[in-house]
Amino acid sequence: MPEATSQKSSSESAVYQRYASAARQREDALCCPVEYAADFLSVIPAEILERDYGCGDPTPFVLAGETVLDLGSGGGKLCFILAQVVGKKGRVIGVDCNREMLGLARRHQQTVADRIGFSNVDFRYGLIQDLKLDLDLLGRELEQHPVRDPADWLTLRHLEERLRHDQPLIPDDSVDCVVSNCVLNLVRQQDRRQLFAEIFRVLCRGGRAAISDIVADEDVPAHLERDPELWSGCISGAFREDKFLEAFEEAGFHGIQVVKRQRDPWRTVEGIEFRSVTVVASKGKQGPCLEANQAVIYRGPFKKVEDDDGHVYPRGARMAVCDKTFHLLQRKPYSGLFDAIEPREAIPLDEALPFDCRRSKQRDPRETKGTDYHVTTESAGPCCGSDGPCC
């Protein structure tokens, strides 16, 4: 067997076996200490709290009433915290491929529901890099139609595709927020592009990902990547810190932010520092670019900034933008950074012409005010309010 194939299979096997064991007995080496609000923890059974393995806290980026997906939900601690954050009108879905961890979470599901007064958590069996395939459904099909020969294997592949299409584990555009806590680094390198594509697929337009994970300040050398113990311990599979952000960008996210970065490394191996970061990224910049004579002015403090579509905004300059970008820049995480300038006469979008978003250009004020705008007005009152003169 080629070395690369052997390493891939051994790393996957090591992850499964180590976390299956950790579902039965706590393993401190898998844990990067994280503190959560005590009132959220009080309803969660001790067995789950003792089997929690994470490195960050993405819960502050989840809102009441939202549908939230937890990738690699493990014993369910984060899901049970989120159940209280989203409340009775919200919904939490946990996905994990480790049956022992999934069993631990499901075993205490009703207990937590009784304690908080409602049931809004669902644990599903699947791979986080393949959120279309429901492994519980696949398992039931295999019980009735086991694979005995190559022909059966081909039939199985067709079955998988049918299940992905007809009964996806997580449908397209169905989730407001995707969270994960120290799990993405456990996914094989060759599956990571699909992993981020799946996160993007399941999010609603305007939704966000809030991901806590371990990153490295340097490339992890091959001999460390081949170590199953280090891989399953969230070390040798760690993303390089800049590549982690690039993965979100390549998947189509925008507004990508490192909202928390551990100052001191969690571990150092052969001089390479490994630490926890939490990244928030948004979905919603895709779509047609239409000209509505709108403009934005970047307030500063930087001399200029560039967005994820390559638009450049010099400080203080009135820049032309399409209708989509105009509204995007007024929402988080950009809100407060730009002044938005509406045209004096609105252009209905069904009458708007295409806007060329491939280049950045300044908007002539007459485009928003109109060439026939020659109004002269008197002072409308103190320009700085009632506290004193404006100069």
Regions found by a protein language model. Name each.
Residues C31-T67, L78-I81, V85:
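Conserved alpha-helix/loop element of class I SAM-dependent methyltransferases that forms part
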Residues N98:
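Conserved SAM/SAH-binding beta-strand->alpha-helix loop
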Residues A105-R106:
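Conserved SAM-binding loop
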Residues L135-L142, W153-V178:
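A short acidic, Gly/Pro-enriched loop at the edge of an enzyme's catalytic core
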Residues R193-R208:
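A short glycine-rich, Lys/Arg-flanked "PGG" loop and its adjoining helix->strand segment in the class I
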Residues V215-I235:
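Short, glycine-/aromatic-enriched active-site segment of Class I SAM-dependent methyltransferases
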Residues G237-G252:
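Short alpha-helix
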Residues A251-C391:
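C-terminal lobe and adjacent flexible extensions of AdoMet/dcAdoMet transferase-like proteins
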